[in-house]
Amino acid sequence: MPSLPPAIFLMGPTAAGKTDLAMALADALPCELISVDSALIYRGMDIGTAKPSRELLARYPHRLIDIRDPAESYSAAEFRADALAAMAEATARGRIPLLVGGTMLYYKALLEGLADMPGADPEVRAALEAEARAEGWEALHRQLAEVDPESAARIHPNDPQRLMRALEVYRVGGVSMSELRRRQSAEKADFDASGRNQLPYTVAQLAIAPEQRQVLHARIAQRFRQMLEQGFIAEVEALHARSDLHAGLPSIRAVGYRQVWDYLDGKLSYAEMTERGIIATRQLAKRQFTWLRSWSHLHWMDSLAGDNLPRALKYLKTVSILA
């Protein structure tokens, strides 16, 4: 038996079949499911996030789904704290935490920990917002490029939340976000030669995706069109009607939602919205693959294989997750 309690990560790109395999594992093992998805946290965003149905969630409860209103933000640090609490509760009940989802930044935060960033400062944020109103976000992006060119290269000028956070970190602490992350990398390795991580668990990491990329692309297109047929536009209309929601929020910037939002604003035709929604989802999958290719200690499975459950169970035994 492992000296640390077991945990399972089930990763993969969007539309790869993670949820189905997670539920099959939950039928076979004493698991508790914990969602690792930055869009599934939001209430009222069900169709466009491919959230499991109420019936499935009743049968297979997931922690960290429907925990925020779309007007609220949710950081990787908040996820890490919530996930660690959920994992500890599952372990205390003698169950295995099974974390499933495709938000790779969240997995990274769990495995590596987070850099010690300054907390939010309301006065600094208010000043930045006033500057943005007066000068525009492009001007703030130029400011960031002067003090933290690495972050400026990663953050688009039209991403106000991340742009404001990077400037806030610098103004509050006097050290750039990039420098703080470099210090973290020097102190904490992703994995050392022994595979140790920052989590107090023996972690088995599974990944699922179609072996052929065109299969995933076809799945993405089919699923997006199905979402539209299931009432995705009406779902976004309900969000669009709220005075406290706008296109700059993380919830509305979620893939699919921002394209339908632009359609409702009259910026896109129906055909353009559909095409851009599919393209944006494919781009998301590409980014997820990029993360996964750099990941250590992953056991890959083909989405189209008919024996993924027994293969996963066999692997979990080989890495001492199961007796």
From Swiss-Prot:
Record-listed E.C. numbers: 2.5.1.75
Single GO term (MF): ATP binding
InterPro entries: Dimethylallyltransferase (IPR039657), IPT (IPR018022), P-loop_NTPase (IPR027417)
Catalyzed reactions per annotation: adenosine(37) in tRNA + dimethylallyl diphosphate = N(6)-dimethylallyladenosine(37) in tRNA + diphosphate
Residue positions binding substrate: 14-19
GO terms of biological process kind: tRNA modification
UniProt enzyme class: transferase
Annotated positions for site Interaction with substrate tRNA: 103, 125
Quaternary structure and partners: Monomer.
NCBIfam families reported in the protein's UniProt record: miaA (TIGR00174)
Name of the protein this chain belongs to: tRNA dimethylallyltransferase
Source organism (scientific name): Pseudomonas paraeruginosa (strain DSM 24068 / PA7)
Lineage start: Bacteria, Pseudomonadati, Pseudomonadota, Gammaproteobacteria, Pseudomonadales
Primary gene name: miaA
